């Protein structure tokens, strides 16, 4: 009896499949990259199916070699790692048995590149190879993908290769310079070095910050009932002790009257569903997870079929997700709490999976798994449901207290929630104290022109706050704001700069500071001094000495590589390649940021072709103004070079 080719599947589903579908799929080989998906598929398909994994990329650039042919349009030189050769042989054997091969790696640029490498290495044929994608691991999603296959998107592959090649160029050309000039075994990278720059510059801002003092003045008034207290703040800060004392002196015999009461409705709108970066930020704030920890947990949830793909720029939700969210809201909270919202991704560069991160089954309010997985799943589910709920409605009341004819006023502001809406389910968190909304409660009832008795007025010396150090969450947000990196790069970038010991995440002890409190009560002004600890930080990112040295060296000699705009513009060029709007330089190979790329490539060539001169030149502070003439042909080959200093022309050469 002839054996029927066994099916190789690397995708996931949690539901049984019909006998007819089994017959159709038995002569198919389906490959994805994750062994966890394979394990789930085994439960889904049963013993009649052989399930395997490519375990990520099956080939890559050599680890220790440059592996890029600069003279031939940046052609990459790929190799199969020794630990993958046995697996590749097994995959080849299975592919030969199958009548149809389905490449089902993740739905992003990295996943597309994995499929392309599989296609090339396994020697697959276009007539019996299909590419399928799904952003959730469910029965319906997988079967729909098989019913609607496509070809490999070579534009996405080119975008991934362009990133890989440019990152290799920057890393392999800059790192040896750091070894020679700073310290052995250091590394530089197109994104990681810019991330370190952000942290170094923030630390310098903190060290150079000079705090300015001013007095915040708060009065406590007794209402006519004799017991109710109204607290209100002076509508300006007082600059020094003398001004405070003069103001309090003028208040000793002043009358205080309610001269204005205003009420206005306020609406709060829910945040969109999670993208990769917003999930990383919110998990750090609410759950205390590191960026890499969040992605590791989210990966497990995805591979278990519990959430959609976790590397995405998109805030879109599918029609199915919108419908199930509506059902969950109507069943639990009622029609008043539901509001349809269709979110659209603003960024043109949203190139990852085409849906936000959400539960695959929103009706499932609990899952099995570790405590960490349950907490992250609950966070994702609540955010998804909240984004389809009604606005919260509040009433904001502002009471103005006049001071006996003075232009200054005391102002009290309070909010009361009249309808909680989405706040019934979810409240968004903030990174820094100064971003947090004030939780002002309900104010006591007062009437216009009502006369109040002053209980006391307290002026407390306060100081301007220094810029906050970055947390992992706020660094992700800043990178995203600058257009640096993409969902797949945030976590590894932050992990890399810590592994390299350019940055540490740790605590910083504060310093003791003295401040004044001046009080007016019972016609008497009193002053006391108190102390407080300021500047203490917990779990913040701080540069190490070597991180600062490396940053300063790169900023001095390679400012183009370190420029925020350069790094962001390269990301846009990768996006353009992914959209098919531009090819690679030369033979459609590599998108070049012409100005900065040319500038730092010229320095690299000096180091590669003229190491002794380069070594001398850097030692004697080579800057752009020292170049008198520099000609580079289209292949970045040095043809003419002349170095000029204050003592005249020191070197002139021609290299064919």
Residue ranges and their predicted role:
Residues 238-273, 450, 460, 565:
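Metal- or metallocofactor-binding catalytic centers and their adjacent structured scaffolds
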């Amino acid at each position: 009896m002839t054996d029927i080719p066994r099916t190789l599947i690397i995708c996931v589903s949690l539901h049984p499949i019909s006998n007819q579908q089994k017959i159709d799929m038995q002569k198919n080989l389906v490959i994805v990259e994750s062994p966890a998906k394979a394990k789930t598929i085994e439960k889904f398909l049963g013993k009649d199916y052989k399930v395997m994994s490519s375990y990520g990329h099956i080939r890559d650039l050599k680890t220790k070699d440059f592996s890029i042919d600069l003279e031939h349009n940046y052609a990459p030189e790929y190799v199969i790692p020794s630990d993958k050769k046995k697996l590749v042989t097994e995959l080849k054997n299975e592919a030969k048995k199958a009548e149809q091969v389905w490449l089902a790696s993740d739905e992003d640029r990295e996943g597309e590149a994995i499929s392309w490498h599989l296609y090339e290495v396994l020697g697959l044929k276009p007539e019996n190879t299909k590419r399928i994608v799904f952003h959730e691991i469910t029965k319906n999603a997988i079967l729909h993908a098989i019913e609607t296959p496509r070809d490999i998107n070579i534009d996405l592959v080119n975008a991934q290769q362009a990133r890989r090649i440019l990152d290799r160029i920057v890393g392999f050309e800059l790192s040896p310079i750091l070894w020679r000039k700073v310290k052995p075994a250091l590394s530089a990278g197109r994104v990681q070095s810019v991330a370190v720059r952000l942290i170094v510059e923030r630390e310098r801002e903190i060290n150079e910050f000079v705090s300015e003092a001013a007095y915040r003045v708060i009065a406590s008034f007794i209402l006519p009932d004799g017991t109710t207290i109204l607290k209100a703040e002076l509508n300006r800060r007082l600059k020094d002790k003398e001004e405070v004392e003069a103001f309090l002196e003028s208040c000793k015999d002043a009358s205080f009257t309610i001269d204005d009461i205003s009420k206005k409705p306020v609406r709060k709108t829910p945040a969109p569903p999670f993208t990769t970066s917003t999930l990383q930020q919110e998990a750090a704030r609410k759950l205390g997870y590191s960026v890499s920890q969040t992605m590791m947990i989210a990966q497990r949830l995805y591979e278990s079929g519990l959430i959609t793909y976790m590397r995405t720029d998109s805030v879109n939700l599918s029609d199915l997700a919108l419908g199930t969210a509506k059902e969950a809201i109507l069943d639990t909270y009622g029609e008043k709490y539901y509001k349809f919202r269709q979110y659209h991704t603003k960024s043109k560069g949203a190139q990852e999976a085409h849906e936000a991160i959400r539960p695959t089954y929103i009706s499932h309010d609990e899952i099995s798994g570790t405590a960490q997985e349950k907490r992250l799943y609950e966070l994702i589910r609540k955010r998804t449901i909240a984004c389809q709920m009604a606005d919260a409605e509040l009433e904001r009341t502002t009471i103005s207290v006049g001071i006996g004819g003075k232009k200054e006023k005391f102002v009290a502001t309070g909010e009361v929630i009249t309808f909680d809406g989405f706040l019934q389910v979810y409240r968004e968190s903030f990174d820094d104290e100064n971003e947090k909304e004030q939780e002002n409660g309900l104010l006591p009832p007062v009437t216009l022109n009502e006369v109040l008795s002053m209980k006391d007025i307290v002026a407390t010396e306060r100081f301007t706050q220094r810029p906050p150090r970055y947390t992992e969450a706020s660094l992700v947000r800043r990178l995203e704001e600058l257009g640096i990196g993409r969902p797949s790069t945030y976590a590894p970038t932050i992990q890399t700069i810590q592994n390299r010991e350019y940055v540490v995440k740790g605590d910083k002890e504060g310093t003791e500071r003295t401040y004044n409190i001046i009080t007016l009560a019972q016609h008497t002004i009193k002053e006391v001094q108190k102390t407080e600890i300021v500047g203490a930080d917990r779990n913040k990112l701080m540069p190490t000495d070597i991180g600062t040295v490396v940053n300063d060296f790169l900023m001095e000699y390679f400012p183009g590589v370190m420029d925020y705009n350069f790094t962001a513009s390269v990301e846009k060029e990768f996006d353009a390649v992914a959209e098919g709007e531009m090819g690679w330089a030369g033979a459609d190979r590599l998108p070049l940021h012409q100005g900065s790329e040319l500038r730092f490539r010229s320095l690299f060539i000096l180091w590669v072709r003229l190491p002794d001169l380069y070594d001398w030149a850097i030692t004697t502070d080579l800057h752009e103004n020292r170049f008198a003439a520099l000609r580079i042909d289209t292949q970045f080959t040095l043809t003419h070079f002349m170095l000029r200093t204050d003592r005249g022309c020191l070197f002139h050469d021609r290299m064919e």
